[in-house]
Amino acid sequence: TTHSCQYAMAAILKAANEGRINILDGVREYAERAHAMKELFTKYGFEIVYDRDLEEPIADGFYFTIIYPGFTGGDLTKEILYYGISAIPLRDTGSKKQGLRACVSQTELNRMPELEERLKRFAADHTK
């Protein structure tokens, strides 16, 4: 039943409020990955689609959004697959904007050099 989940969540939040656990420790690595990946994507010509929520900068987390000039989200999804990079079109998430949602969970920090090489090749093939 849902009561079990609610009790578990209440216990986690209580422990966090009492200082017995730090609930951010488990997700900090995702922020580091997102930050590193965003730097690489923007270095090679990609733009961040959603960088603010109202007036506040969006924190680095489990995913981020990108677009490459001249592409729709669907076309970019297909094109980056040729370079061994995957993401989903923003339209599949309900967005009206063109772009991709890139998830950081499967890309560990030790794979950033590999990602950079792939992005470098993509940019070289698509720079006008």
Regions of interest found by a model, annotated:
Residues 1-128:
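PLP-dependent class I/II
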